[in-house]
Amino acid sequence: MKIVAINGSPRKNGNTAQVLEVVRREVEAAGVEFQVFQPGAKVHPCMACYHCLNTGSLRCVQTDDMVNDIIAACIEADGILLAAPVYHGGISGNMKCVLDRLMLAAGCGVNQLHHKVGGALCTLRRSGGMETYQQLLGTMDAMEMVIVTSDYWGAVHGADPGEALKDEEGMEVAA
C-alpha cells in the first residue's frame, strides 16, 4: 500500500513539512509506503488548454515543475493526503496551482482518482483552518475520492516553524 502526500507549503521546513514528517513515521511504522511531494514556490497555474483532457495523456503540457510527477504518483497511489498551510483564509497559491492541474489531468473526465482514498490536513496560526480544510475536501469530492475523516478537523496550530509540533491535540489528530 502506498500513500502520496502533497505539501502545499512553499516553505521547505515549515510546519506543514514537520507535521507530515510525524505522519510519515506513523504510516511507515504501520508498513505503508509514504511519499511526500513539496512543489515549493515554482508551480505554474493551469492554462486551461485542455491538452491533458482532450488527449487523455494524463500529463500537463507544462513540464518545468514537478506537477507531472505528482500526477503520476497520485494515479499509482492507494491513498492521497493533501496538506496545506492557511494563507489568508485558504490554501496557498502554489497548492491551488497543483490541485487545478491534478484535477484536470487525472480527475475530471478521465477520473483516474475515482474512489481513491483521500485525507486532508492544514496548518495554521489562528484562523482560516475550516475554510482551507473545506477547499481540500472539496477538491477530493469533485474527483469522487473516498474521503477519510476523523473525530476532529485536520488542523494543527502553529505560526513559526516548529510551533505546530507543540499543538498536542492537533498532532494527535494528524497522526
Regions found by a protein language model. Give the residues of each.
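N-terminal beta1-alpha1-beta2 submodule of the flavodoxin-like/Rossmannoid cofactor-binding fold
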Residues: M1-C108, G158-A175
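Short, glycine-/small-residue-rich phosphate/pyrophosphate-handling segment
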Residues: G93-N94, C108-G154, E169-V173
